[in-house]
C-alpha cells in the first residue's frame, strides 16, 4: 500500500488470478487438513478484494479489472463446495463493482471458465466428472477470450460453447436438478 501511495501509478489493468480449489466432500477435506477450506476463502475472496481495494484509487477511465471466477460460480457444486462458493463471491463482487465503476469508465470482467488444463488440478485433484473431462479447455484460448471480452466491456467472460450452455442452463433450470446432473 505504501509503495502505491508513494509512486501513484496509473494502473490500466488489474488481473486478480490467484486462487486454488480442493475436490472432495467438506468433511473429507476437513479431515485432511483443517485450515485448507478457510485458506481457500482467504486466497480466493479476501486477497482478491484486498488487491482490488488497494488498486482502485489508481484506476481511471479506460482501466480494466479482470477477476478470475469460474463456471463453478453458476451453481452449487457438491464435492467442490467451498471453491464454488468462493467463485460465486468473485462473480457477484465483480458484477456489483462493475456497475458501481461503470460511470467512471472502468470495466470489471469476471472470467468464468470451466475446467482449464493448468497446474490447478495438481492440487485440487483431477476431475472425476466425465463432463469436466470432456470440456477441458486450453489456458491460452481462455485468456485470449477473456482479454477480448474485457476489451469489449463485457461483465462476464465465458469460454467455449459447453460452458456458455452451462451458463444459460443455470439460469433456466432448477439448481436441484443441476446439482444432481453433476453426479453423473
Regions found by a protein language model. Name each.
Residues 1-10:
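Conserved amphipathic alpha-helix within the SDR
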Residues 21-38, 79:
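Conserved mid-core segment of classical short-chain dehydrogenase/reductases
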Residues 52, 86:
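Active-site helix of classical SDR
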Residues 58, 75, 96-106:
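Active-site-adjacent segment of SDR/Rossmann-fold oxidoreductases
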Residues 70:
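Residue(s) in the substrate-gating loop at a strand-loop-helix junction
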Residues 110, 130-167:
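C-terminal helical subdomain
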Residues 113-123, 127-129:
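Short, flexible catalytic-loop segment of classical short-chain dehydrogenase/reductase
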